[in-house]
């Protein structure tokens, strides 16, 4: 691979895009009313899925970071992506609270927890001269995700229902993060 200054910007773009897509948990509340109404779940039981997601995301972060160092950031992202997109896809079939907790809370949470710590350190290694700015810009990607995707998700929920929307979003995440991961390469020693 020919390493140039453009390479680091390509890596940054991939990291920024993954941040945009994996910030989906920020608009998971859009699914509350349709799913609790359809299945008779309580709001608090539904909300616990988000808590489980965030706990799992944080708990698995160490594993994601360690794997990225051992096998490569890209491979770690792909493993996390399978869990993340798979969890969202299976959430589209969940008809009970335990299924919601396993598919969204544990599976999607574990996937997100593997993706982010594989991405951010990789971007920062490419930009030792701008680590603060790059970190902030990656975080901006996470903020743009809900801003861009919430209206799309709400439109899909209104047109095809919450469960089908979960499945559609899973496919979007699979494609989007898959493309983003292809842009991410480890920083060579001495860069």
Give the role of each language-model region.
Residues 7-27:
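Pair of pore-lining "gating" transmembrane helices in MFS-fold secondary transporters
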Residues 24, 107-119, 142-144:
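Core transmembrane helices of Major Facilitator Superfamily
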Residues 20, 87, 98-114:
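Hydrophobic core of transmembrane alpha-helices in multi-pass small-molecule transporters
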Residues 59-98:
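Conserved MFS/SLC helix-loop-helix module at the cytosolic interface between two early adjacent transmembrane helices
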Residues 141-189:
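Helix-loop-helix hairpin linking two adjacent transmembrane segments in secondary transporters
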Residues 35, 105, 113-127, 134-135:
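Intracellular juxtamembrane helix-capping segments at the cytosolic ends
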Residues 26, 54-62, 147:
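Residue-level signature of mid-helix packing/kink "hotspots" within the transmembrane helices
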Residues 34, 65-66, 155:
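Membrane-interface helix termini in secondary transporters
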């Amino acid at each position: 691979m020919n390493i140039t200054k453009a390479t680091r910007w390509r890596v940054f773009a991939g990291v920024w895009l993954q941040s945009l897509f994996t910030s989906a948990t920020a608009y998971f509340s859009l699914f509350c009313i349709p799913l609790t109404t359809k299945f008779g779940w309580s709001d608090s039981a539904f909300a616990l899925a988000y808590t489980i997601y965030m706990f799992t995301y944080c708990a698995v972060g160490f594993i994601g970071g360690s794997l990225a160092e051992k096998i490569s950031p890209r491979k770690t992202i792909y493993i996390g992506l399978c869990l993340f997109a798979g969890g969202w896809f299976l959430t589209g079939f969940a008809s009970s609270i335990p299924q919601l907790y396993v598919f969204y809370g544990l599976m999607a949470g574990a996937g997100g927890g593997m993706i982010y710590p594989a991405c951010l350190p990789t971007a920062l290694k490419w930009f030792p001269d701008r680590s603060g700015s790059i970190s902030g810009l990656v975080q901006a990607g996470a903020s743009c995700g809900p801003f861009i995707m919430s209206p799309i998700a709400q439109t899909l929920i209104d047109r095809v229902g919450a469960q089908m929307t979960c499945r559609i979003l899973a496919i979007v995440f699979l494609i989007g993060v898959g493309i983003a991961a292809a842009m991410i390469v480890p920083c060579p020693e001495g860069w």
